[in-house]
Amino acid sequence: MIKSLQRFVGSDAFGGVILIIAAALAMILANTDWTSHIYQAFLNTPVEVHVGSLHINKNMLLWVNDALMAVFFLMIGLEVKRELVCGSLASARQAAFPVIAAVGGMVVPALIYLLFNGQDAVASTGWAIPAATDIAFALGVLALLGNRVPLALKVFLLALAIIDDLGAIIIIALFYTSDLSILSLAVAGAAIVALALLNLFNVRRVGLYILVGVVLWTAVLKSGVHATLAGVVIGFFVPLKEQDGKSPARSLEHALHPWVAYMILPLFAFANAGVSLDGVTLSGLFSLLPLGVIAGLFIGKPLGISLFCWLAVKLKLATLPQGTTFKEIIAIGVLCGIGFTMSIFIASLAFGDADPALAVFSRLGILLGSSLAAIVGYLLLRRVLPVQKAVA
């Protein structure tokens, strides 16, 4: 009994359970009269950092989303790089699979949303809301299945979600960002060059990559682009090749894993899942905006991912990840309908100033669509994934 409990606490499934508990707690606190103001006060607590002439002043919510989540994306970057170099994405046709899947997972949900809202000039600006995937929550749900999930399937989700996030960042920059700082982007470019040079000269001190990475993160943050992108870039440049039996990338990935699973992701869930339902009515649920979001996330995501994957295999543009089945890909497609925080962020950019009522209705659609995707995606994966024999 004790050994079983120890195995569970040390498993990915335990991290998924903590994340879901944190999300549920946030929803309760945000929608209870005597705790909602405490919850909001915590999220809005200002935290300032001064280093010379550099001044960063963000509230607690933004520090979690921009700083801590950059660490999460650093670990994701390390994992994807490992699979690109020597794993399930090592060939061009294997690597093309998640790229094609991500394109389908963005295009089809956006088109379905526009089927519902294309005639409304204001509502149609939210077309990108169902195109996003919340990688943290999707991985949290996947983690509930523990060692039943093949590594290739997890890497497929990671790669797909990263490309999806990159697509969302590009969409935000092109359609929802009024001004970008050219100077900050230039500094970010210089930092990327510095990381490339460190890798080129086989510098194996992880601390140097982190130091340059902090400069990169700060520049990206100041540029107006989503700062978590810096984490992925850093992860791609940390050396993977073993020397004297040690790999900097593998060592860093191993060191980050418990911090990400048991602290960063639960904090992220707690800070972002507390969406107030104040002003949401049952009649609002059946308006075109939330229905378009729900259909885009719950139907458009799996349809787009599955259809584009099927076409890619049939046209011999890509191959299924080794050891996976098409049923598993469909189930992962459903799971990718968890838009949640990235969708809420895009909705706030699309409707926050123009129409607060539309922002409320879009949140309702995001919550329902993402919840449906999480529950059905988990149940489908539980059904299609083989059960692993317990180790005595």
UniProtKB/Swiss-Prot annotation:
Pfam families per record: Na_H_antiport_1
InterPro entries in the cross-refs: Na/H_antiporter_dom_sf, NhaA
TM segment ranges: 8-28, 60-80, 96-116, 126-146, 155-175, 181-201, 206-226, 255-275, 279-299, 329-349, 360-380
Chief subcellular location: membrane
Highest taxon above the source species: Bacteria
GO molecular function, one term: sodium:proton antiporter activity
Localization: Cell inner membrane
A GO BP entry: regulation of pH
Catalytically driven reaction(s): Na(+)(in) + 2 H(+)(out) = Na(+)(out) + 2 H(+)(in)
GO CC annotations on file: plasma membrane
Alphabetically ordered keywords of this record: Antiport, Cell inner membrane, Cell membrane, Ion transport, Membrane, Sodium, Sodium transport, Transmembrane, Transmembrane helix, Transport
Topology with respect to the bilayer: Multi-pass membrane protein
Matching HAMAP family: NhaA
Stated family: Belongs to the NhaA Na(+)/H(+) (TC 2.A.33) antiporter family.
NCBIfam families in the record: NhaA, PRK09560.1, PRK09561.1
Function: Na(+)/H(+) antiporter that extrudes sodium in exchange for external protons.
Protein name, UniProt field: Na(+)/H(+) antiporter NhaA
Organism, scientific name: Edwardsiella ictaluri (strain 93-146)
